[in-house]
């Protein structure tokens, strides 16, 4: 029987019941609230991440935009945690599901767009028609700008899904090759294992970078509408 490369991306079930919500809640359990007066290393790391994200993403926002600070910090920590969770053996990565990523991207994008239409409707409508556009091109440009606006959440979700899925497929392929070559040639198997180790380190970086890129783009959409 041939192995299905996408079997690891199928939503896991136990007795026909999806355990995806449990997997999504698991990262929150890792970052539990401290019960001591003195912070430990984990709390210090969390505070450092909060300060870094706040400095990098929220410094360009006005007062209305900074109201999203906690949401964006929660978003980047959630995406990074779920991406890293998928690198553990016998685990499932929720961010490889396009439906979940669309479920995150669409509400956040829609919230920024609605905020823009509420706070500065003239400026938001002006994006659909650049200044100085020739009259014959006005209908076509309005259609193009409208399509580009609605493509934003799709691009957010597809980018995250494609990058995480591609990395997991490469790890799966090279890991299977390493296991198959271990009984044929120890030298070649060692080389492929070294490649697998380096690729795993690269995927850790990709998991963190994709979480940062997703949150940064949401922050830029928010900045354009506040």
Curated annotation (Swiss-Prot):
GO terms for molecular function: proton channel activity; proton-transporting ATP synthase activity, rotational mechanism. One of its GO terms (biological process) is proton transmembrane transport. It comes from the Eukaryota. Its main location: mitochondrion. It holds the Pfam family ATP-synt_A. The keyword Chloroplast does not apply. The chain crosses the membrane at residues 14-34, 68-88, 97-117, 138-158, 164-184, 193-213. Keywords: ATP synthesis, CF(0), Hydrogen ion transport, Ion transport, Membrane, Mitochondrion, Mitochondrion inner membrane, Transmembrane, Transmembrane helix, Transport. PROSITE patterns: ATPASE_A (PS00449). It is a multi-pass membrane protein. The keyword Hydrolase does not apply. It catalyses: H(+)(in) = H(+)(out). SUPFAM superfamilies: F1F0 ATP synthase subunit A. It is found in: Mitochondrion inner membrane. One of its GO terms (cellular component) is mitochondrial inner membrane. Subunit a, of the mitochondrial membrane ATP synthase complex (F(1)F(0) ATP synthase or Complex V) that produces ATP from ADP in the presence of a proton gradient across the membrane which is generated by electron transport complexes of the respiratory chain. ATP synthase complex consist of a soluble F(1) head domain - the catalytic core - and a membrane F(1) domain - the membrane proton channel. These two domains are linked by a central stalk rotating inside the F(1) region and a stationary peripheral stalk. Belongs to the ATPase A chain family. Component of the ATP synthase complex composed at least of ATP5F1A/subunit alpha, ATP5F1B/subunit beta, ATP5MC1/subunit c (homooctomer), MT-ATP6/subunit a, MT-ATP8/subunit 8, ATP5ME/subunit e, ATP5MF/subunit f, ATP5MG/subunit g, ATP5MK/subunit k, ATP5MJ/subunit j, ATP5F1C/subunit gamma, ATP5F1D/subunit delta, ATP5F1E/subunit epsilon, ATP5PF/subunit F6, ATP5PB/subunit b, ATP5PD/subunit d, ATP5PO/subunit OSCP. This is ATP synthase F(0) complex subunit a. It comes from Tachyglossus aculeatus aculeatus (Southeast Australian short-beaked echidna).
